[in-house]
């Protein structure tokens, strides 16, 4: 699959029978078998039996025969659903999540379920029960999380598309660490029905692909706005650079991102620094309060709707990740967030959305641009530090709290650790964001 230039070209090759869907399936299985040490799939059973086959009745649909994997907090009928935690081992989903149904209707083949950070509560995908997800492009280094298995499956060439979830950066962080594209749509644009949640306010279904062009292609199909000709592009645009997000950067991250801006500037893109101090202060009031308050009710309600019989304490008692266990125990006890504090944070969320609208308008900018993660990809031996979580989501969490569409693309130099550069657009401007970042991607690739 890696020799296929774009996902659209792969779909065309399948439709024209230049490649057989079964051949594509066998290639993916062979690649996974060679790369089992990546731990990017959760397989309760053999891979062959859990890897679907192209539905001949759907031949002619847009994604017919394309293998797609799903983070293991997403329901796929007949496959295990563990949310990356030992306490749910053996549970089989009896329904498809809405996003799975959509992709199946487009002809996609379910390749399996991806490993993840336990219960989505982290950014490393170092999973004590299922194994740490390896980084295919930087062996020995962290794959990121919580959708780390999805990023690794795409980056290694097992699948061209994976579906993950993003609460505060859980798609974009692993995409940046694995040198691929991660797209979080405007919150609510893709249904979260059939997904084990962290926070109904912040959770978002999104896409992990090799390129921004691939993400644009798939999102167009999912949103029903796919066209047979390129979207009208506005050309180079004015992009805001939030000062806080460009501060205290690792040297390699800073160099890679500044080099990318320099290339874009030469082709007509305009950049302006944005003083975002008031935005940062407001954003910090939502980062942990909202998801940690909502998780316990949302998680329990989700399990009940899926037919779980054992209660949430059966799961919590078997949590293996020490950091996750600490968070859960703290917030079930003395650290429980008060309802008034939660409601205040929700009000701040509405204020944040208004302030972001004003920021785009006041500075006459079309996009925001910033390094996806301020630090370099950590080695696996050093990634599981509690303080790394806050560092990793420092830049990505604003888009989550303001419900903006956001995408990261790789800009790191060949042969060095991956670096991601992110772009956000105003809410509901998903197609505009994807179109412009696809253009940016082409400029950067020369």
Swiss-Prot record:
The active site is at 71 (charge relay system), 146 (charge relay system), 170 (acyl-ester intermediate). One of its GO terms (biological process) is auxin biosynthetic process. Keywords: Auxin biosynthesis, Hydrolase. Pathway: Plant hormone metabolism; auxin biosynthesis. InterPro entries: Amidase (IPR000120), Amidase_CS (IPR020556), Amidase_dom (IPR023631), AS_sf (IPR036928). GO terms for molecular function: hydrolase activity. Transmembrane segments: none annotated. Its EC number is 3.5.1.-. Belongs to the amidase family. PANTHER family: GLUTAMYL-TRNA(GLN) AMIDOTRANSFERASE SUBUNIT A, TRANSAMIDASE. Hydrolyzes indole-3-acetamide (IAM) into indole-3-acetic acid (IAA). This is Indoleacetamide hydrolase. It comes from Pseudomonas syringae pv. syringae.
């Amino acid at each position: 699959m890696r020799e296929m230039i774009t996902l659209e070209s792969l779909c065309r090759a399948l439709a024209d029978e230049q490649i057989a869907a079964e051949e594509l399936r066998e290639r993916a299985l062979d690649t996974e078998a060679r790369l089992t040490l990546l731990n990017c799939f959760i397989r309760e059973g053999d891979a062959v039996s859990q890897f679907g086959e192209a539905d001949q009745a759907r031949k002619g649909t847009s994604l017919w025969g394309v293998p797609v994997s799903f983070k293991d907090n997403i329901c796929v009928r007949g496959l295990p659903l563990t949310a990356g935690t030992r306490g749910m081992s053996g549970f089989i989903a009896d329904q498809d999540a809405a996003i799975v149904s959509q992709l199946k209707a487009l002809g996609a083949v379910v390749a399996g379920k991806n490993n993840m950070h336990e219960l989505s509560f982290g950014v490393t995908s170092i999973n004590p029960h299922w194994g740490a997800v390896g980084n295919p492009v930087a062996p020995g280094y962290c794959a990121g999380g919580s959708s780390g298995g999805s990023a690794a499956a795409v980056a290694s060439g097992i699948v061209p598309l994976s579906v993950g979830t993003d609460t505060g950066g859980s798609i974009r962080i692993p995409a940046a660490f694995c040198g691929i594209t991660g797209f979080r749509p405007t919150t609510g644009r893709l249904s979260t029905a059939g997904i084990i949640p962290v926070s109904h306010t912040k959770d978002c279904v999104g896409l992990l692909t090799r390129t921004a062009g691939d993400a644009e292609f798939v999102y167009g199909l999912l949103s029903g706005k796919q066209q047979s000709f390129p979207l009208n592009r506005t050309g180079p645009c004015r992009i805001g650079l939030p000062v806080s997000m460009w501060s205290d950067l690792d040297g390699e991250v800073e160099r890679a991102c500044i080099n990318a801006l320099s290339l874009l500037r030469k082709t007509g893109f305009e950049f302006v620094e944005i003083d975002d101090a008031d935005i940062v202060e407001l954003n910090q009031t939502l980062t942990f309060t909202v998801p940690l308050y909502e998780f316990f009710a949302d998680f329990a309600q989700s399990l009940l709707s899926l037919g779980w019989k054992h209660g949430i304490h059966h799961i919590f008692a078997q949590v293996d990740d020490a950091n996750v266990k600490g968070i859960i125990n703290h917030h079930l006890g003395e650290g429980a967030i008060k309802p008034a504090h939660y409601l205040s944070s929700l009000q701040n969320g509405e204020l944040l959305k208004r302030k972001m609208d004003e920021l785009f308008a006041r500075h006459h900018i079309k996009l925001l641009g910033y390094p996806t993660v301020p630090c370099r990809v950590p080695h696996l031996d050093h990634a599981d530090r509690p303080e790394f979580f806050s560092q990793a989501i420092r830049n990505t969490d604003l888009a989550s709290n303001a419900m903006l569409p956001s995408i990261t693309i790789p800009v790191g130099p060949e042969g060095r650790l991956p670096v991601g550069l992110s772009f956000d657009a105003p809410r509901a401007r998903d197609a505009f964001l994807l179109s412009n970042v696809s253009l940016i991607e082409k400029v950067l690739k020369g």
